[in-house]
Amino acid sequence: MCEHHHAAKHILCSQCDMLVALPRLEHGQKAACPRCGTTLTVAWDAPRQRPTAYALAALFMLLLSNLFPFVNMNVAGVTSEITLLEIPGVLFSEDYASLGTFFLLFVQLVPAFCLITILLLVNRAELPVRLKEQLARVLFQLKTWGMAEIFLAGVLVSFVKLMAYGSIGVGSSFLPWCLFCVLQLRAFQCVDRRWLWDDIAPMPELRQPLKPGVTGIRQGLRSCSCCTAILPADEPVCPRCSTKGYVRRRNSLQWTLALLVTSIMLYLPANILPIMVTDLLGSKMPSTILAGVILLWSEGSYPVAAVIFLASIMVPTLKMIAIAWLCWDAKGHGKRDSERMHLIYEVVEFVGRWSMIDVFVIAVLSALVRMGGLMSIYPAMGALMFALVVIMTMFSAMTFDPRLSWDRQPESEHEES
């Protein structure tokens, strides 16, 4: 049945392109795509107060985390302690400015910027509309790049690695950092993209009938990748957020494969070159990713060895294989099993960033283990190569258009008549 209702009552699924008529949602309810199961929108209770409270609390915890010592270590009576702000400083001093920059961006600056942006937007700060649109656009683009919780996991892994050399303690800022990780995740979770954009600017009018259960491409429609507005397929710029777009991402497979090949080329030196060098009583011992896993396993740290093996070796390898498989299927060589491809894509998107855990482990070890001739740990070129592998695979997954996997799938079972 064709409907002439305002486009605000409908949404195009960003994952499978199905047009869905949104039901009336009570507080706490969510609408999901009947075709692929993707969450389309969530009706949060107190949509302004909740993210505001979480964001303010998270920013306060972030401030406390940077004011006091974070972790400390004692080896043979020699004590070393660091603050969070000292970690990038050490990396810069060791001529690994790129790793220090990654730490500052992904662990500190990106989460802080996103939290401040949430406060400004959900509370309707007196800002020019164009600036609000730009902030909202950047907010959802940067969301994936906030890695505070991954850094926390890296710190815990570092503790296990260092317990064989001395006693490890946490400083006054460790608990605030743990709280910050939880609060900032909750602040992001309580901001619904569709609600936020509707609050910034109204949905553009659409002067053509809408048919729920039919894909947008069959109706001559496309979804704005930024603000979820439903637009005519031939309209290149969204009138609400000014984002350029197309029915399908232009050259999606070409970009995805190019970035995938780049990550594969970087992955080889990342596993061959040392990721860190341990200077113990004047004896320098370079260590690769696999050597670190073997050492942890031989010392009986089986859970940590398994975590590092999964995050640093299995996940990047399987992610690259999965992305190649998605591209192969999107080219029409698969068995039209779109649901399986969609599940693979969701897993790839979720787990890919967690491979940064090994990079953060090296950052913590390099900053904390500074004990002169007794013991010191330095980052090595393999760590930079591995960080670039993770970043390239993340970009590769982002440039892939998941709707390509659904374009060959029949949709008659979802069409309303």
Swiss-Prot record:
Database matches in NCBIfam families: pqiA_fam (TIGR00155), PRK15103.1 (NF011683)
Topology feature Periplasmic, residues: 72-101, 278-284, 368-370
Principal location listed in the UniProt entry: membrane
Function according to Swiss-Prot or TrEMBL: Component of a transport pathway that contributes to membrane integrity.
Induction (free text): By paraquat.
UniProt keywords, alphabetically: Cell inner membrane, Cell membrane, Membrane, Transmembrane, Transmembrane helix, Transport
This protein's name: Intermembrane transport protein PqiA
Subcellular location: Cell inner membrane
Keyword Cell membrane (UniProt): yes
The species this protein was found in: Escherichia coli (strain K12)
GO BP terms: membrane organization; response to stress
Sequence ranges on the Cytoplasmic membrane side: 1-50, 123-256, 306-346, 392-417
PANTHER family tied to this protein: INTERMEMBRANE TRANSPORT PROTEIN PQIA, INTERMEMBRANE TRANSPORT PROTEIN PQIB-RELATED
Annotated gene: pqiA
Membrane topology, as annotated: Multi-pass membrane protein
Family membership: Belongs to the PqiA family.
